[in-house]
Amino acid sequence: MVKAILLDIEGTIAPLSFVKEVMFPYSKKKLREFLEKNWEKPEIKKIVQEVEKIEGRELSLEEAVQLFSRWIDEDRKITPLKELQGHIWEEGFKSGELKAPLYEDAYEKIKEWKEKGIPVYIYSSGSVKAQNLFFGHSVYGDIRNLFSGFFDTKIGSKRERSSYEKIAKEIGLPPHEILFISDNPEELKAAKEAGMKVIQSVREGVEPSGDFEKITSFRELEI
């Protein structure tokens, strides 16, 4: 029996296109201006120092701009990049330049689960900070109260079984009582290996996999 739901964001409850076509280009467009303005701030210095450790060299502002810009183009799942993007997106969401779209069927179903007392968690490669911004400034307003918790790559890669085992521990349930929904077959495979129930969300632009149960809308879910 499913006692908790774990959800991916992009391609599952929000269009893939928003992140790729709106959020990523926004973070790249604002990158230089943001770093120039905030280069001396402790939280930004800390992010740059993490990158310097990865690169094994010190970075000038110009080099940091070039490197982050390249990583955005390559869609690299690197924690300091995600944290920096989180800061940039924060400005965008708070100014009203960015508003997070959600599939209506997903929003309605998450509300229904909340009313039934079924906890819903998010696991995304975007930082927890970015997730809070996303759900705090959605087209339906601030809906963070619909979720019981947020996980990002600090707990581990979404393609590793151990990440899902750790999440189950954090949630406080055995994996077989948690349902994970994602568009990504590799993530679903890792979650299944950890013992979770899994369903593939097949939205526009998503390639269906033959290995998993599928839905095209959250209205198909009966929990």
From Swiss-Prot:
The protein's assembly and partners: Monomer.
EC class of the enzyme, as a word: hydrolase
Function statement: Bifunctional enzyme that catalyzes the enolization of 2,3-diketo-5-methylthiopentyl-1-phosphate (DK-MTP-1-P) into the intermediate 2-hydroxy-3-keto-5-methylthiopentenyl-1-phosphate (HK-MTPenyl-1-P), which is then dephosphorylated to form the acireductone 1,2-dihydroxy-3-keto-5-methylthiopentene (DHK-MTPene).
Full protein name: Enolase-phosphatase E1
Cited Gene3D superfamilies: 1.10.720.60, HAD superfamily/HAD-like
UniProt pathway annotation: Amino-acid biosynthesis; L-methionine biosynthesis via salvage pathway; L-methionine from S-methyl-5-thio-alpha-D-ribose 1-phosphate: step 3/6; Amino-acid biosynthesis; L-methionine biosynthesis via salvage pathway; L-methionine from S-methyl-5-thio-alpha-D-ribose 1-phosphate: step 4/6
Cofactor note: Binds 1 Mg(2+) ion per subunit.
Keywords noted in UniProt: Amino-acid biosynthesis, Hydrolase, Magnesium, Metal-binding, Methionine biosynthesis
Organism: Aquifex aeolicus (strain VF5)
Disulfide cross-links: none
